[in-house]
């Protein structure tokens, strides 16, 4: 099926999306890095409007999520404590950029990042912050994110680089 024939829908998350969001996360990240169903339950309850879900023919294939805060740097504590979300915060944090393996390299994650960037700008944020592994630095740079160096994060016991997009 050609992409033109596929019905693509981008929307925010509701609690009804909990199980499919957790399933996609489990398919995309190792257990040591993946958020749990319980963590997603808290995140969706606190900031479901800061989840961007992409459905292809009614199947969730990609999502981006993260809280908003006045803190300038993304910390490991943010992953674990959804209640730290500040709806009027200055920075949109991006915790995860997920696309199921069979749907990668079709631009889905990029569409969601562009939507998250547009929404953050429209909401008057200072910008967005994410952490990534070194191999993904050039990918995020294409969207205007600047590498700020090694993050203090020890999430999943790997080295993360903090990247920031300022408006």
Predicted regions and their residues:
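A short beta-loop-alpha structural element at the N-terminal edge
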Residues: 7-21
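Hydrophobic adenine-recognition pocket in adenosine-nucleotide-binding enzymes
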Residues: 13, 97-99
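Active-site rim helix/loop that mediates acceptor-substrate recognition in acyltransferases
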Residues: 31-57, 63-84
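Conserved acyl-donor/pantetheine-binding loop and adjacent beta-alpha core of acyl/acetyltransferases
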Residues: 63-97, 104, 154-159
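Conserved catalytic-core motifs of GNAT/GCN5-like acyltransferases
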Residues: 69-71, 131, 141, 146-162
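Residue-level recognition of the GNAT/N-acetyltransferase active site
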Residues: 100, 133
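Conserved acetyl-CoA pyrophosphate-binding loop and the N-cap/start of the following alpha-helix
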Residues: 103-115
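Conserved GNAT acetyl-CoA-binding A-motif
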Residues: 113, 120-132
């Amino acid at each position: 099926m050609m992409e033109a024939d596929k019905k693509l829908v981008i929307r925010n998350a509701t609690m009804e999306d909990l199980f499919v969001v957790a399933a996609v996360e489990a398919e995309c990240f190792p257990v040591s890095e993946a958020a749990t169903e319980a963590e997603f339950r808290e995140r969706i309850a606190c900031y479901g409007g800061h989840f961007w879900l992409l459905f292809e023919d009614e199947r969730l294939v990609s999502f981006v999520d993260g809280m908003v805060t006045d803190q300038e740097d993304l910390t490991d504590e943010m992953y674990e404590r959804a209640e730290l979300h500040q709806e009027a915060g200055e920075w949109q944090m991006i915790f995860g950029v997920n696309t199921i393996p069979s749907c990668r390299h079709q631009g889905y994650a990029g569409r969601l990042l562009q939507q998250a960037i547009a929404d953050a700008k429209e909401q008057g944020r200072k910008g967005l912050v994410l952490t990534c592994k070194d191999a993904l630095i050039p990918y995020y740079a294409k969207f205007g994110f600047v590498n700020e160096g090694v993050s203090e994060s020890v999430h999943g016991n790997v080295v993360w680089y903090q990247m920031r997009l300022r408006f």
